[in-house]
Amino acid sequence: MSSDSFQRQLVQRTNTLNSSIDNATLTILSRFQDILDIAINEGKDKYTVAPEVYQIECHTVSMVRAVEQLLDVSRQIKSYWLTNSLSTSFPTVDYSEPDLEKVKRTLTKLQNHLLEVSLIEPEASETTEAPTVSDT
């Protein structure tokens, strides 16, 4: 899979998840506002309050569904992350065995050189004497 198609797929998934989050958030906020508008109880009789209680229950159920939708989005993101669903589409680079062996040899040489340098430096610091202060 090419890098461009992977990027398009990633953007599409991101946009889908963002729109799900936006829709759920909008539903929660609008239903909460509806509940607040209905909840104003200024001298209402019980025949008016009863249908309003039912409306509040319906809005509450809608809010719960929206929260469940947000939890589902969270689960999807975790699933993509845990199963590497996003990274399985990364373009792969094919290495041949000679290339890997060359890299291994180069890293081994570098490691050996660094070990030699670290062994030489302490010996050099041991042979140098600290400057002395003369009494004059």
UniProtKB/Swiss-Prot annotation:
Function according to Swiss-Prot or TrEMBL: Component of the Mediator complex, a coactivator involved in the regulated transcription of nearly all RNA polymerase II-dependent genes. Mediator functions as a bridge to convey information from gene-specific regulatory proteins to the basal RNA polymerase II transcription machinery. Mediator is recruited to promoters by direct interactions with regulatory proteins and serves as a scaffold for the assembly of a functional preinitiation complex with RNA polymerase II and the general transcription factors.
Organism of origin: Schizosaccharomyces pombe (strain 972 / ATCC 24843)
Gene3D superfamilies, alphabetized: Mediator of RNA polymerase II transcription subunit 22 (6.10.280.160)
Gene Ontology CC annotation, any one: nucleus
Cellular location(s): Nucleus
Protein name listed in UniProt: Mediator of RNA polymerase II transcription subunit 22
Assigned protein family: Belongs to the Mediator complex subunit 22 family.
Single GO term (MF): transcription coactivator activity
One Pfam family recorded for the sequence: Med22
Disulfide bonds: none
Oligomeric form and interacting partners: Component of the Mediator complex.
Keywords: Activator, Nucleus, Transcription, Transcription regulation
Any GO BP: positive regulation of transcription initiation by RNA polymerase II
